[in-house]
Amino acid sequence: MKLSLLLAAPLGTLAADCTREFLKSAADSLLAAQAAGDPSLLKPVGSTLEYNENLKPATFASGILKTALKVDHSRHSLDTTQCATYTELISATGPKPYVNGYQLWFTNGSLTRFDGIISSTGDWLFNVTGTLHWASREAWTEIPADKRDTREAIKAGGDAYLDIFSDKSVVVPWGRPCSRLEGGAYTGNGGANDRCDVGIPDNVKLTNRRYVIDEVMGAVSIFLTFGSLADSHEFRLEGGKLRFVHTITPMGGNPGPSVGKGKGKGKGFRRRGEVL
């Protein structure tokens, strides 16, 4: 399904320099489309569009946007350098729970690539109650201009975290506190001593990385291949140090471990590398 270029033109004209305002408007239209189950509300869409879900080709007709989801929590990252967005969406109170990540990529003011990482019951450590509980308590606020890290530093921080899965000699800019929300499990309790350097497996390569970087939020979204699985890792850095890590890992129909029905607090639970 594609919108006409006539519909896309007004926003496309405004987006000539890819402003934060344009990107937020487009990302908000994604939320509207997902809430209504109506892909035509996603704007502006180009005359050609590459559409992927869980790193596999899909279409609007068969994809997640055809399912109306109650949006209980959402957050955007806006990358004006690459003209791209990342959106985290948690749907906890609808008929079927979801925790999804979306990267949207724009060319000449129109959407030309859609990537979704879609997770639900049975996926890695899935517990939407825990995800919503912790995500809604974290502070992902704008970082003052004089305290922002560079794009290069933000990307390097995310890459270092991912690289340590295959090379334990990598120096990762761990923050303290640093909290990881993995599925619905949390490596702490929201306190000053939270750590996210626990439960990291060995000898697992995280490849095919695609980045959306927002210096204003200190955030980088990375879609990647985790062994054989589609995966989303998102990081927030503050003062050059990792502060928050969010992960989404669909299991491709192979049920993953759960963390029960509680808030998902735990340490040392990350063992994906042993089962791929």
Model-derived regions, located:
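C-terminal and inter-domain tail/linker signature
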Residues: 13-276
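Fungal secretory targeting signals
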Residues: 1-17
